Curated annotation (Swiss-Prot):
One of its GO terms (biological process) is Golgi organization. It comes from the Eukaryota. This is Uncharacterized protein YGR127W. GO terms for cellular component: Golgi apparatus; peroxisome. It holds the Pfam family TANGO2.
Amino acid sequence: MCILMATRAHPDYELILISNRDEFLARKTHATCWHNNDFILSPYDLAKTSAEKQIFGTWSGINKEGKLATILNLKLDNEQNNTKSRSRGLLPFIFLSIHKADFEDWDNYKKFEGHYDGLKSTGDFNFFYGDVIKKQYKVIDSLGRTFDVLSSTCRKDLDSYMVVSNGKFYDSSSIPGQAWEKVKVARDSLENLVLENIESDEEKIISSCFQLASKSSLPSTISNPDVLQMVDPNVTMNTIYVPPLRRPPRDDLGASIPDGDYYGTRSQIVLLVSKDSTRVTFIERVLYSSDEDVRKYSVTSPKEEKRFKFKL
């Protein structure tokens, strides 16, 4: 179960974004790079690249005009829309690929659908997207809902923080008990991260962000590759970082088509945008990219790190 955490509460940053991609480790992906004529910075899926080798499915990225987007699967209890065929990963790409787009033309479900007629046939999703220059951010989902998010920069204001996972999204006005446990933990931890790093330099903040992304509430024995243990998929609703877990008999993980034996947090992204929205730092840590990597790497010793800095 993926998770996205974001805040505008730090005095030195317009946005701090932390993202874990939970997936089958054997799923073929490309680490973060500039692509589409160096306009989009993101990792991307290798499973569904187009014939033109230009259109990629991606889960999180930003473009050179300050538009950013992160897609997460939406797990519905009744599995009512599991026959939808369009790739979720196209949504970030479609939004990020448009040059000189006015965010106000995209800022709700109906407007987005006007630009992309495949929205209703896309697999169930929660989609965060925005414009760091205009300082406007939204969440839409496959149920047709639109939420204003991150509308405040006050550290004590709930609207300064946002956490999205694979369950139904609830904004700051919703009943806390409705959210998954990992979302509640992440929300409290995100506020603490800001408070503890008010005077920290950027490297310390980056380190704190990855520490939060790596926070696990599961016993360490669960992820021991020598322990042949099938795990209840529901445990992934309770922990921010999901260690490599052997695939259970049923694949009810809110993920894509099963691929390989292990499922878990395979990639972590930290994105920082300066307060004046002119400087971006984007870091991806690839923890694992195959089942064999479980024995070679770990959350504290990732397989690969990609780091980018650029100006808007």
